[in-house]
Amino acid sequence: MAEATPLYQIRLAVRAELSDLNAGDTVLVAVSGGADSSALAAGLLAEAKEKAIRPIAVIIDHALQPNSADVAMNTKAELAKAGYTNVEIKRIKVEVTDGMEASARRARYAALNEIAESTSAVAIFLGHTKDDQAETVLLGLARGSGTRSLSGMAERIDKYRRPLLSITRSQTEAACKEVGIKYWNDPHNQSMEYARVRVREKVLPLMEAEIGPGIADALTRSAKILRDDADALDQWAEEVLDEIDPIEMDIETLASLPRAIRSRVIRKAIYLAGAPSGSLSAEHLEPVEALVTAWKGQGAVSLPGGVTVARISGRLSLS
């Protein structure tokens, strides 16, 4: 039996993510013009035809580089040659608030959500690969992240699906060559200014050279294990929250919980009280934890979103 080609391996991965969809459904695929998203678009187009699903390729032009409009038009032309009849270019404005990468990502997802709503798309496909996952885990380790962050990117979250987390970047490049798609190499992906690029170009190759091959595989396996653990811990914390008042939490009840559960309960309660999603760090939570486990009469803790946490009469009070 002949070895499966890179494109066929991508098609198999996409097929698994289409298994719960129905004929006539609309799906989006975000395409940057790079090898990963272009290969995903090719695999999705082939599999969508088999299931009579309507794929729309979406090119987000962040307008952050002088030739971004040209890149978007060239990408649209390549997708048209590959067989796409529905391609949308969305030019967006990135307001930088917390770093260029994070701000661009937030603006990109907002645009994708808007297009998904306007087209009634049931899923949005993203081209993150095994290499991206390994880089994410290593960056999380370097930053001292917790279980959830170290679990990397989810295969599915809300409408978003990442079928290529088991596929390598070399496979996506080979798949593009296989189908004749000319892909774009984003100069930002070669700039050592970015930590992710330094991990990709220096750290991972050094680990492979000094420790041995298979580092990306090992990191992605660890991410999957950690995601399963994080899901279980989150579920436990949700069950605790269902039994208590998240605005007035009993100190003895909180103190009796394992720290991993207590920290999740406190974090979730703070978000329920109005802290912006994703705004809490370990530095924010440590003084709140101390109100429970190292009480010395300290005052209230001020948190993002104007949330305040204080210990009052044996309770952790949020306002």
Model regions and ranges:
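Core alpha/beta nucleotide-donor-binding catalytic domains of modification enzymes
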Residues: M1-K202
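Inter-helical turn/loop segments and adjacent helix faces that build the functional surface
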Residues: L206-A218
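Short, surface-exposed loop/turn segments at secondary-structure junctions
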Residues: D186-Q190, P213-A216, G278-S279
